[in-house]
Amino acid sequence: GTIQYQELQVYDGMVYLSNSVTDEEIRTIMNTMDEMGKMDRYMEMEMMKEPIAASADGKTEDVYLCVPEDKDMVDEFMTFRDRTSGEIYHLTDDGVILTEKMAKTLDVSRGDPIYIGVDGEEKEVTVTDICENYMEHYVYMTAELYEELYGEEPGYNSILFDLKNASDKEISD
């Protein structure tokens, strides 16, 4: 778990929101934390609480879909990299980043198509990169690609955040 949380998912915390929370309520929560002087930065993200189906060549597996609000800012919270070469990847509107074990399970490589199903709608996407990961299976896509595929904005249901000067003790308390 050390590599996962110190090198790959490098945010201090995540807040899951109920479906009924409004954008205004989210801003109020974030402004309050900001005013308390605790918040360094934050970003909203759609993170499916239930896995969705990802399939390729007749193989289907469960995967969690993650759609960060800001494809440029996501690099401050997560590192997408090749496990062996260390090459860093960035989310683009051209396709998805798939975690390594899922890519192996589906037997797909960079440039291959996969199908992902959201709310019963199966869409084809291209695997642009395959990233190192040790916990669960994820597929990452930009908000712009999500909108293009599904005709609506992602329903942001979580907030990733970093605290100012957070020590390991403060984070665990």
Residue ranges and their predicted role:
Residues S20-R27, S167-S172:
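Short, charged/polar "capping" segments at the starts of alpha-helices
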Residues Y5-G13, T22-P113, E122-T126, I130, ...:
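Short beta-strand boundary microenvironments
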Residues E7-Q9, H90, I130-S172:
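Small-residue transmembrane helix packing/gating motifs
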Residues G1-T2:
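Short, strongly hydrophobic transmembrane alpha-helices
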